A protein has these predicted regions:
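Carbohydrate-interacting/catalytic domains
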Residues: 1-65, 71, 96, 101, ...
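Active-site-proximal helices and loops of the catalytic beta/alpha 8
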Residues: 103-105, 129, 189, 199-282, ...
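Hydrophobic faces of well-ordered beta-strands that scaffold small-molecule active sites
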Residues: 7-10, 64-66, 109-111, 196, ...
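Active-site clefts of carbohydrate-active enzymes
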Residues: 283-305
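Active-site beta-loop-alpha junctions enriched in small/polar residues
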Residues: 14, 69, 114-116, 201-203, ...
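Short catalytic-loop micro-motif centered on adjacent basic/acidic residues
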Residues: 110, 195-201, 300-301
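Short, well-ordered coil/turn segments that N-cap beta-strands
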Residues: 60-62, 105-107, 192-194, 220-223, ...
Length: 458
């Protein structure tokens, strides 16, 4: 699967493109369809993503994960239409042009798909509001006419986790499933998307995910499905019948927390529990989506108590098993915290142009290591995980496949450190050093403050 050898880059388009936070009043589907037939507009806000294509290609990005760009009430997850691009961003032709530009740069497109719920402005829900019992769409939702909603609709309905601006879809209704699958087909044929990120996949009907898996594989044999999951056993949905990957929130927490508490035992425990060589390790052979921040959680530059740990944190991210995903702007360390008057929008700012710095150059180096067609990339993308030396302030682990072994050494503090281990004997290619020289080690390895080293056994 191509995704297992790729660095992802996440863009939240409504924020990134500076769109208004609230949409205009809902319009009929046919009116959206008419606007969709217009020619591409080079000044459409969504075209900003295409303008970053050269930068993303140079950075080593192989896929862009685009959070919901479809017509919605406000933040994208309160969908009005699953068939057309949000008017605040542009039109369907504009998004098709964005996808074409990304593909021309060798970058695949994964769309954030919201199948668990829709917004109150969703066309079928508005029909129920108007026609009540007589609406042919009343069974598309979990509705009772024996009660009332907090909005006074004249009926009760189930919202997502108590958020009644998000109306839960009935995924056991064949008509709903057919509508969703037809929407996916249109995205694949009209935009050429290469995969989906499934919002709140942990809540989706399992039979629906099985059918989606079969349907998308028929569209494109290498179509990737990545689910949003928080806790629990990821094997329940990441398997041969459902999803290819899911978000690794366990290791997300372990990454920043290990640096903040100066306790590398935490992330080492999580990584071994998930990917280690013991029979009880639970995700061996799986490729989970790894990240240090995203559109729902504080930026790494804000959550780290020691900002000098940005570099070793990204070194850990790219060295551990999984699919690394960078959230736009974090590659040069922009801050962002939840709460305050802007709420989650503070995590989703408009950015005019890239502002690369030394951190960006380091992440670029890491991304290109992962995407290379060589032994080191195979070890980093597919190699087994093994802890070698664990200290509170330092961690040395191994990624090994049939033809390559890479040692990843991380120093989480502002003082030098010398590792000692039998695995540090022999010749190694110092992958992150200038010109990647071969070094001879005799059981010890020196690390500068906050340094990360990747050593390929020669």
């Amino acid at each position: 699967m191509w995704a297992y050898e790729t660095t992802f880059y996440q863009i939240y388009p409504l924020g990134f493109c500076g769109a208004p936070r609230e949409n205009a009043a809902p319009v009929a589907e046919d009116e959206l369809a008419q606007a969709a037939n217009a020619a591409p507009n080079p000044d459409a806000p969504i075209m900003k993503i295409a303008q970053w294509a050269d930068y993303l290609q140079e950075l080593g990005i192989g896929a862009v994960l685009i959070n919901p760009p479809l017509e919605s009430d406000s933040h994208g997850y309160d969908t009005r239409s699953l068939r057309h691009i949000d008017r605040r961003l542009g039109g369907d032709a504009d998004f098709a042009a964005v996808c074409e530009t990304l593909h021309a740069h060798g970058i695949r497109v994964v769309l954030d798909a919201v199948f668990n719920h829709v917004g109150r402005g969703f066309w079928a829900f508005r029909d129920v509001q108007e026609r009540k019992w007589d609406s042919p769409y009343k069974d598309w939702f979990h509705i009772s006419f024996d009660g009332d909603s907090c909005y006074g609709d004249g009926f009760w309905y189930e919202g997502w986790e108590g958020h009644f601006e998000l109306v839960k879809l009935n995924l056991q209704n064949p008509a709903v499933v057919d509508y969703l699958l037809e929407s996916v087909r249109r995205w694949a044929e009209g935009f050429g998307i290469d995969g989906l990120r499934l919002d709140v996949a942990y809540m989706l009907d399992r039979d629906f995910m099985r059918r989606l898996h079969t349907f998308t594989r028929e569209l494109k044999p290498d179509f990737v499905l990545i689910g949003e999951t928080l806790h629990g056993d990821y094997n329940q949905i990441v398997n041969d019948e459902m999803l290819d990957s899911c978000t690794n929130y366990e290791c997300y927490k372990g990454l920043y927390s290990s640096f903040n508490s100066v306790n590398m035992f935490e992330i080492a425990h999580s990584l071994h529990r998930q990917f280690g060589g013991d029979p009880w390790c639970i995700y061996r052979g799986k490729h989970l989506l790894s990240f240090v921040d995203n559109h729902d959680v504080p930026r790494l530059a804000s959550i780290l108590t020691d900002k000098s740990c940005l570099r070793p944190a990204y070194g850990m991210l790219f060295g551990m098993p999984g699919i690394p995903c960078i959230y736009y702007g974090s590659e040069w360390g922009i801050p962002g915290e939840k709460g305050g008057p802007d709420g989650d929008w503070a995590l989703r700012p408009a950015l005019d142009e890239p502002a690369p710095n030394e951190l960006t150059a380091f992440i670029k180096q890491l991304a290109h290591l992962r995407s290379a067609d060589d032994a080191a990339a195979r070890a980093l993308n597919y190699g087994a995980y093994r802890n070698v030396v664990i200290q509170n302030k330092q961690l040395l682990f191994e990624r090994a496949c049939d033809d390559a072994t890479v040692l990843v050494a991380v120093n989480a503090v502002g003082e030098p450190y010398a590792f000692g281990a039998g695995e540090l004997n022999g010749s190694f290619v110092d992958l992150l050093a200038d010109d990647a020289p071969t070094v001879e080690l005799t059981g010890a390895l020196e690390l500068a403050p906050y340094e990360v080293r990747y050593l390929l056994r020669a």
